[in-house]
Amino acid sequence: MHDKTLTELAAGLRAGEFSSRELCQSALDRIQRLDGDLNSFISVTAEQALADADAADQARASGDAAALAGLPLALKDIFCTQGVRTSCGSKMLDSFVAPYDATVVEKIRQAGGVSLGKTNMDEFAMGSSNENSFYGPVKNPWDLSAVPGGSSGGSAAAVAAGLVPAALGTDTGGSIRQPAAFCGITGLKPTYGRVSRYGMVAYASSLDQGGPMARTAADCALLLETIAGHDVRDSTSVARVVPDYSAELDTSLAGLKIGLPKEYFGDGLDPEVETAVREAIKVYESLGAKVCEVSLPHTHLAIPAYYVIAPAEASSNLSRYDGVRFGHRCEDPTDLEDLYKRTRAEGFGEEVKRRILIGTHTLSEGFFDAYYLKAQQVRRLIRQDFLDAFDEVDVLMGPTAPTPAFDLGAQKDPVSMYLQDIYTIAVNLAGIPGISVPAGFAGNRPVGLQVLAPHFAEAQLLGVAHQFQQATDWHLKRPAFGKEMA
């Protein structure tokens, strides 16, 4: 069962080929046997999962099964889950148990989905390799010496290894799409505001967005239908009708206009990655699409702008972790200042401290105008680049990341790590949706094709990705890891 897609498992449950308990128990057995080598989960909620599976079986027997009834899933450990630890991969929240569910968690429960646990992540979603977790690095099931990408590396690795058929991640600068590419799965970052952020621990509030990670675009469509929608508890969520994404997958690509940003095919792009991506684009041409070159002239400014805006917002958001109300608290503080200093020094990891310092500096008097306001001006230029491009073409395509997954410990320099997100960060700054789909290999490591669409054009994005997956089999490839366990 572990090789099946989410939609295939849903069909199997409807046909009575197996029960939800059997399905969830099988997944839990794989997690127990295999995750010691991957470290993709922080918490596994086996007892609750089996109880939820039994409830789903009873609902199905009574003819009252919801859309995700009985399907096992995993949640990135950034989503609040009532009664279950929500750590954000940090010592600071190692003992924090949320008193409520995030909106997306609530929606998945209402749809009958069964959470098997919380997945590992870069601390507070700050990282591109999943090496910045208090709970240790996650390994890539395609090559255990490689990173899975980040910050949603636990979710990506768990899906790729067949521990769960799908998971939720979050994307602030590429944290769904880049690990999806590195692990050979499909990952969708929705339009900013399409999915509620209520109960999703904040990193950079104007950039964060939750989304699905799964085997296929069809799986992502099924999940997005469930988690998307307006939420009065999130002032940034948008009141727009949620389409039937699954019904719109079977779309013709004849006449589709594809733009290839020339800035995405320049220096720094691994030759094997470029070859795989260009071969994928040839598939689209064979399906009737038209391809042309476009320009996103401010792409080179995306990383510097992002690393002003995101740390500034993080500095503000993470100021609440001071040892007073919740989270880690240092022992025997001498006074309030000592409590603050030692709690934060002990509770945060190095990358989080680095970004807080950058953010505090950019927001400080004398630097706010020079850095933060300038970065916001650049952000508007980047957004306009995309709007201008979409006046000419329907979608944009290019590599998700400039290289395949790199070795654990290989990227020691923070700037070289930040450059891994060069093709994904601008998408968050502009707020548009993007999807990464498996498109080949560089050696034994997967390559992702990134497809971008205008704001709220997820239906088109998913349809374009689905048609590619109907014509290719890259999404059907599975790593050798765990194959011995049927």
From Swiss-Prot:
Keywords: ATP-binding, Ligase, Nucleotide-binding, Protein biosynthesis. The lineage of its organism: Bacteria, Pseudomonadati, Pseudomonadota, Gammaproteobacteria, Oceanospirillales. It comes from Chromohalobacter salexigens (strain ATCC BAA-138 / DSM 3043 / CIP 106854 / NCIMB 13768 / 1H11). This is Glutamyl-tRNA(Gln) amidotransferase subunit A. Heterotrimer of A, B and C subunits. GO terms for biological process: translation. GO terms for molecular function: ATP binding; glutaminyl-tRNA synthase (glutamine-hydrolyzing) activity. InterPro entries: Amidase (IPR000120), Amidase_CS (IPR020556), Amidase_dom (IPR023631), AS_sf (IPR036928), GatA (IPR004412). PROSITE patterns: AMIDASES. PANTHER family: GLUTAMYL-TRNA(GLN) AMIDOTRANSFERASE SUBUNIT A, TRANSAMIDASE. It holds the Pfam family Amidase. Its EC number is 6.3.5.7. Belongs to the amidase family. GatA subfamily.
